[in-house]
Regions:
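Conserved catalytic core of sirtuin-type NAD+-dependent deacylases
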Residues: 1-234
Length: 234
């Protein structure tokens, strides 16, 4: 979530983040979300309201621009844990949302997904099957995350011509260190690994990265851009 922090969105796991104000087991728990139906939807209605007020920041714009400018030379894949749409609004296209999208609703019964945008959910039933318990299209705790399969497949196919850029993560949910260590233990050589966080995280093994920039994402852009262009000789 650190990627979107500079846009003004609250993160979940920082000391003053959303989980310091709300119990995640009340608003992000697959085992009891129907029981807490009203509270859950109130929480995500508020998140959409906040999302409507912010704009992509410099790093969103840089990543989207890099994707556009290197099209045909570099395949850029944005694997994001963020549930906002700021990468999309910046113009990025090849995006995989590992934990769902705040601007969508899903029917657990029939699987129908509808775009709600930034408006509040009015508790209307599923327009396809009539189910009255429509859920935010967010991966809750204790819920399967189907996009993780793509994450592991992509990392399993990396080669020495590829680069991994990690921006704004604590490493506590998707343990990027474990993923990198796992694939490298199987003989996969990743050409360049860059980490950009505000500060070190006990869940991230710095020794796995070639370049580390502890700074705001927007401030790290010049260094990241230099490393990427040198690596791919752009």
């Amino acid at each position: 979530a650190g990627l979107s922090a500079e846009s003004g969105l609250e993160t979940f796991r920082d000391a003053d983040g959303l989980w310091a104000k709300y119990d995640p087991m009340d608003v992000c728990n697959y085992q009891n979300w129907e029981k807490n139906f009203d509270l859950v939807h109130h929480f995500y209605n508020e998140r959409r309201k906040e999302l409507a007020k912010v704009q992509p920041n410099a790093m969103h714009n840089y990543l989207a621009q890099f994707e556009r400018e290197t099209k045909g030379k570099v395949e850029v894949i944005h694997l994001t844990q963020n549930v906002d749409d700021l990468l999309e609004r910046a113009g990025a296209t090849n995006i995989i949302h590992l934990h769902g999208k705040l601007t969508e609703l899903v029917c657990p019964k029939c699987g129908n997904i509808e775009t709600i945008g930034y408006i509040a959910f009015d508790k209307s039933p599923c327009h396809k099957c009539g189910n009255t318990k429509v859920k935010p299209q967010i991966i809750f705790f204790y819920e399967q995350a189907p996009e993780y399969e793509k994450l592991h497949r992509i990392f399993g196919e990396l080669e020495k011509e590829d680069c991994v850029l990690v921006v704004g993560t604590s490493g506590r949910v998707v343990n990027i260190s474990s993923i990198i260590a796992f694939v490298e233990n199987f003989g996969i050589e990743i050409g360049l690994k860059i980490l950009n966080n505000l500060e070190p995280s006990e869940s991230i093994d710095e020794s796995l990265f070639d370049k580390i920039f502890y700074a705001k994402a927007s401030e790290a852009i010049p260094n990241i851009d230099k490393e990427l262009k040198a690596f791919w000789r752009l």
